[in-house]
């Protein structure tokens, strides 16, 4: 079985969030199961690859051509499409993102002709479901890909007959994610709990009715973790290796983390995108109380400008209690996972989340909100702590409960959990077989 993963990002070539980790790791896990899976990405600025051909495709009623590159990483074949608009620094965040990714998808459908099945990821690849046998994965329902219908049908050449409530229309606009849900043969999302939540008005982002209508082909498959990449026993970013059986090297990581940050323990760490979805408003509101109780806070990430300003200000006002790194720095992220006393994952909603898995693997217990994939991955009271209420008091309660139960012991128990891709890969192979009938 030959499967083409089509996505905007994949580790280690381009990474913004957890989607990249999934797309980079799943093909490796599928290989032993007899699935030959390749990954197709846009040729983002700065990516090096060997040019292997050219792809002709139609856009806005005329033929365009895009160079096709190839690169092998970790045994996975990555294909890069050099369509117009992608020789830039960032993966997302440009005013013409809809046009860029529609152009990419139209070129991708030509590459997909050589495969049995397309596995399309999020709104950027959703258009493929209208052209090829597709499994469509929703990584985050909040980003749906809304496009002006006049532009959409001019760019793609698709018929206006698709612009109705049972197909692409969504409150007067084209919704690419809705198209993926409607036209894909199978739809997955990244945890069982999130698959249930998105069928409700609270979490459905306006698509809960569509998802309920297509519930028969919807399945929640928990993301795995690339346990070769995230392994404290051989992590090159750590000062010393350690395992659950011999955790002595973790003390070296804590010492190095303290030296790099200047924060004395206990340190609570947040590593990830600066986004209100991630519950960072709770962290800011709870911060004065946390500092009063003797905790320190380490925050690392980029994203929302208002949140970035708030954490810069918090560091200025509390130089001994807060450290903020507004950057993507993998070395410091690994050191935080290993060296902090706990990680905070207080999300408003969370499709799956990888931070809590990585931290658990590194023996650092998470304090997480009981939503989505966090419920499916954090064993409350054993490998971490869950809290229900989206309120600063809920977060404070979770932190205090963790340390009352014993954060260090809970971290060691968290290391027992199997987050590998072996089980999820088998589940995806079954979904592929169903999609191909």
Curated annotation (Swiss-Prot):
GO molecular function: alpha-1,4-glucan glucosyltransferase (ADP-glucose donor) activity; alpha-1,4-glucan glucosyltransferase (UDP-glucose donor) activity
Record pathway: Glycan biosynthesis; glycogen biosynthesis
Record field: catalytic activity: [(1->4)-alpha-D-glucosyl](n) + ADP-alpha-D-glucose = [(1->4)-alpha-D-glucosyl](n+1) + ADP + H(+)
BP term (GO), one: glycogen biosynthetic process
Transmembrane annotation, as ranges: none
Documented EC number(s): 2.4.1.21
Residues that, per the record, bind ADP-alpha-D-glucose: 15
Assigned keywords, A-Z: Glycogen biosynthesis, Glycosyltransferase, Transferase
A UniProt-annotated Pfam family: Glyco_transf_5
Cited Gene3D superfamilies: Glycogen Phosphorylase B
Uppermost EC category: transferase
Family according to the record: Belongs to the glycosyltransferase 1 family. Bacterial/plant glycogen synthase subfamily.
Function in brief: Synthesizes alpha-1,4-glucan chains using ADP-glucose.
Protein name in UniProt: Glycogen synthase
Organism whose genome encodes this protein: Thermus thermophilus (strain ATCC 27634 / DSM 579 / HB8)
Origin organism lineage: Bacteria, Thermotogati, Deinococcota, Deinococci, Thermales
């Amino acid at each position: 079985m030959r499967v083409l993963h089509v996505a905007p990002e994949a580790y280690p070539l381009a990474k913004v969030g957890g989607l990249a980790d999934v797309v980079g790791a799943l093909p490796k896990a599928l290989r032993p199961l007899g699935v030959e899976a390749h990954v197709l990405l846009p040729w983002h600025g700065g990516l090096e690859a060997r040019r292997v051909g050219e792809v002709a495709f139609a856009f806005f009623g005329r033929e365009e051509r895009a160079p096709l590159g190839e690169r092998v990483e970790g045994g996975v074949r990555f294909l890069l499409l050099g369509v117009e608009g992608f020789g830039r620094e960032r993966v997302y965040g440009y005013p013409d993102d809809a046009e860029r990714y529609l152009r990419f998808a139209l070129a991708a459908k030509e590459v997909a002709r050589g495969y049995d099945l397309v596995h399309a990821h999020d709104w950027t690849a959703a258009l493929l479901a209208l052209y090829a046998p597709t499994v469509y994965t929703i990584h985050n329902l909040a980003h749906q890909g809304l496009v002006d219908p006049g532009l959409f049908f001019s760019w793609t050449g698709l018929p206006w007959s698709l612009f109705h409530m049972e197909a692409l229309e969504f409150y007067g606009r084209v919704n690419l994610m809705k198209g993926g849900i409607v036209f894909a043969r199978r739809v997955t999302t990244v945890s069982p709990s999130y698959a249930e939540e998105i069928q409700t008005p609270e979490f459905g982002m306006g698509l809960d009715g569509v998802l309920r209508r297509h519930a028969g082909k919807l399945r929640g498959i928990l993301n795995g973790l690339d346990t070769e990449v995230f392994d404290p026993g051989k992590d090159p970013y750590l000062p010393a290796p350690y395992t659950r059986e011999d955790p002595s090297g973790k003390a070296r990581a804590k010492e190095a983390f303290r030296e790099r940050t200047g924060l004395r323990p206990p340190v609570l760490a947040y590593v990830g995108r600066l986004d209100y979805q991630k519950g960072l408003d709770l962290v800011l509101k709870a911060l004065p109380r946390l500092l009063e109780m003797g905790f320190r806070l380490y925050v690392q990430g980029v994203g929302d400008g208002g949140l970035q300003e708030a954490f810069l200000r918090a560091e200025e006002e509390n130089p001994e209690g807060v450290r903020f790194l507004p950057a993507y720095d993998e070395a410091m992220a690994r050191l935080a996972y290993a060296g902090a006393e706990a990680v905070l994952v207080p999300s408003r909603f969370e499709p799956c989340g990888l931070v809590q898995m990585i931290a658990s693997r590194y023996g650092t217990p998470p304090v997480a909100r009981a939503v989505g994939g966090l419920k499916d991955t954090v064993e409350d009271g054993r490998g971490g702590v869950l809290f229900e209420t989206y309120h600063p008091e809920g977060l404070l309660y979770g932190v205090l409960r963790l340390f009352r139960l014993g954060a260090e012991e809970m971290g060691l128990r968290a290391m027992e959990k199997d987050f590998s891709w072996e089980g999820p890969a088998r589940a995806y192979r079954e979904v592929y077989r169903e999609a191909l009938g």
